[in-house]
Amino acid sequence: VLEEVIVFGRGERLIGVADAASEGAVGGADLAVRPLLRVAELLEVVPGLIAAQHSGSGKANQYFLRGFNLDHGTDFTTYVDDVPLNLRTHGHGQGYLDVNGLIAETIERIDYRKGTYRVDSGDFSMAGAAFMTTVARIDNFVGGELGDYGWQRLAAGGTVPVGGGEFTVLGQWKTYDGPWEQPEDLDHKSLWAKYSHPTSFGSLEVSLSGYHAEWRPTEQIPEAAIGTSVCENEFCSLDPSAVGETLRWIASARLLGQDWRATLYAQYYDWHMMSNPTYDYQISQFDRRWIAGGRFERSFEINPTLSLRAGIEGRYDDIGNVGVEHTEEGVFVEAIGRHAVKEGSAAIYTEASWQPIERLRAFAGLRADYYDFEVRARMDDVPEGGKSDSIVSPKLGIAFAATDSIELYANWGKGFHSNDARGIVDPADPVQPLVEGRGREVGARFELGKFNFSATYWWLNLDSELKFVGDSNSVEPGPATRRRGYELTAFWRPTDWLAFDAAWTDSRARYVDNPDGIYVPGAVENAGEFGIAFVSERWEAGVRVRHLGEFPLVEDNSDRSDPETCVNIRGAWKHDNFYVYAELLNVFDEKGKDMVYSYETNVPGLGPLDGRVSRAEEPRTLRAGIKLRF
């Protein structure tokens, strides 16, 4: 009988390995015992990142990190086995990051980094990046869950030997109504399969994943409407005709050698959603596309003190139909914007690591990106055209191990994010194709036994936050910004079966020159997390405490959000082939807000309402399940 080995990814030794104090990894028991309201909360392993939701379980989440309201992913990029998930020139928002199709059991490890300091992170990575690695195999199982507010989940999966390799497949089906007046009626199906085969040079991995969801979103509502004849409480649904649907398929093949890797992928994506954020003008947004791309990277050891890695990557988005229409109660009224877009990009990068003395490491890298945009109008009176752009992003870093337990870091680099192709070709008010940002940070890492601690102070300057807004099919101006802040993280594993982790982040975001005010709306000023993980032969438990701090709602800081703290817990019992578990989410029934904005709405029967518009945090929720392993 083999003894089970419990692994905590946060406990890995990173002194002499990491290039910056803000880098890290999470895996193993860290993920297995984590209670989750929604799968996007897996990304909250990144210190300071908060994944919220304002429009139903099928829509991409709202992300906060390093003083950014990342909308749905603009400056935070995510990869799964080297395949990018962010969508550029999307029907709702640039860099749209929908991870709802992930099956939690498939994620084995998440490596994360912050800032603009690494050459293999390009578009959408100025705030940070997450690299998810999926499992190679899994014990055969079938399981089911039930919970409050119509939550149901069925899942099954396993691994079988095939042709000298291993074939792993998992599938899940979820339904959920939520606490909303209009039941969400979520119908979610996802499938993931992976074939792994050893080769003479390393390994081959071929993967296929599919995801389909339909839902009826209850969006943010004006707080002034709560308690009136049209809105009984914070869970009211002011437009019950809103609907959403997502279909996504991803196929990929990856070859992994000792000092190189190559990835090819193809994706099909079809999305549409009706929403009514102002409640007097319903819109229908849509996006249908094919994506193809790949990456090749190789490392070279020049001599014992100097190593080099170089890579190329490319991506092509053939967007057949993207835009927005005016609808009323789900019925088409008029088209606002409808385009076909072909967007291609290519990049080449190289990075050198030099260790002149035993305790000192220095890094220098260079990345060059080229983008080509071709926009064709699919209706009259909307702009079309073509444009190309390029950008070069240098990176520098240094790491000094002051002792065996302390390493100091300094990093600097340039990065970028692309803008929506439709805004780039708008002759009236064109946006910049590629927006540059400059980041730097200093930090330290302390590791002693099973305890580690890191501290980082960072700065990030963006030339412009001009962007194309899918809701209105128009360009929204935004001036240059300056951000800075600090991050503290800690992990302690006093015994093999018990671990604690904590993180606290603080940030300050300001416009450089804005007549309406210097404060950046939605820029969270602090966030924190504390966790306990307990894993033994028969029992597992996890506790997560998440704090989301205040942020300005308007540029002059005259209205601000309220802070909120949420506690989630999970417990499980294992016996032979049975695994029984339960999660209690929002343990203390916090009456917070998942998302808050400030703008004018016009609710029928109430007239214009100017002020806070929010979506309530979901109330205390109990879920329980059982898995049978065979």
Regions found by a protein language model. Give the residues of each.
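Transmembrane beta-barrel wall of Gram-negative outer-membrane proteins
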Residues: 148-175, 180-218, 241-256, 300-306, ...
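Short acidic/polar hinge/loop motifs at secondary-structure boundaries
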Residues: 83-114, 132-133
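Gram-negative outer-membrane beta-barrel transporters
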Residues: 357-362, 370-371, 458-461, 477-555, ...
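Extracytoplasmic beta-strand/coil segments of soluble accessory domains associated
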Residues: 8, 23, 40-87
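N-terminal periplasmic "start-of-domain" segments of outer-membrane beta-barrel proteins
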Residues: 3-34, 59-62
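C-terminal beta-signal and adjacent terminal beta-strands/loops
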Residues: 500, 547-554, 572-630
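Short strand-turn segments of transmembrane beta-barrel domains in outer membranes
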Residues: 111-119, 128-160, 170-171, 179-181, ...
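Membrane-embedded beta-barrel scaffold of Gram-negative outer-membrane proteins
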Residues: 254-275, 401, 405-413, 434-496, ...
